[in-house]
Amino acid sequence: MDRNVTADGGHGRATALAACAAAGLALAVGLEVATYPRWRQWCLTWGATAEEATGPLPGDDLLAEPDILSTRAVRVDAPASSIWPWLVQMGPGRAGAYTYDWIENLFGLGMHSADQILPQYQGLKVGEAQRLGKRGPVLRVRILEPERSLVLRSDDGNWVWAFSLVPEAAGTRLISRNRIAVPDASPIARALNTYLMEPGSLIMERKMLLGIGQRAERLARSG
């Protein structure tokens, strides 16, 4: 009798906890769906000025009408010459992406962010390609203007990732723009892109931009 009561009680508690967890998740999803439209623009243009967010950048013509467009930026207290080496060595199996490696590697991307300049990856050329994971897209260098712009496009043409360096009086603006097309996405997939992938991309890209900036500033200080 006591054993059955204990078992029933444990089952009841587990059911109650599961119900609470489901209710909490539903509430969190509902809140995001309700509030995200109010801060979506901030999410997609974090750190960028109005001019940077709306102005033209190299690579825009490679995907004229994206479904998703983000432009994010940081100010770096270093010249473009101290930022550029970190950009050209980025990638899986290279210098990583300077973001949360453990999250990247959950998706099998093989990212290991370097804290030093790797000479073997400094000779990037137009046409070079790198695959993001075993089944991920292949990104190929399409535009390379040293210390000014680096633009990659996926071989399927649905993703353009552009980096621009804009000198200022005392530093450099580092701008990252993503143009993404999802032509065959279902309504559910588009909703997931909006409410899950966009905020997630901000978390990862913010870390990346700040990480590049910190490394560049350290390099500039070292002379």
Give the location of each predicted region:
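Short amphipathic, positively biased membrane-proximal segments
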Residues: 1-69, 73, 81-82, 164-173, ...
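Glycine-rich portal/gate segments that line the openings of hydrophobic small-molecule binding cavities
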Residues: 56, 63-64, 75-82, 88-162, ...
